[in-house]
């Protein structure tokens, strides 16, 4: 809508892709970053309590490709894995799949269920006793647990501190999108969100403030 002139401002939880920059070159799309978010591999609390507290990148890839189908193959209970993916255009999916596969649009034949919003996926994982999915850190709770990532001999803990310190690999910027320089009232709104009061709201919403940084 922004690129087509139907809206003055939009939102995206990922960067504008190279293809989008080419496709909408005349629109001069620009990002205005207002926060940071971590994306974690999440599992049902029953799986977590049964011993699955960490997964390697290769194991996660194997699960989504349908090569690993039972939790017992990765140290968990003897239970079929309910693999939950997101709609392919979702920003959460883009950064997660880019890290796991090196391809933001990777197809995942092991998927049993495709969801849209983080809210929907959180509910599906919580309702199951054997699910895996991908969610923003802001959606972790007692029923939906984040596992740590193992990659090349290193363990990456899914904590806000790790994101802030640059020690967690799946991080994305939360952006406003405008076509060219924003209009005066739109710029005032963006400046507010980047300012102290707006950044307080960002933090209260479960994300990491970044102030005026782009």
Language-model-derived ranges and their functions:
Residues 1-214:
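Exported/periplasmic ABC-transporter solute-binding proteins
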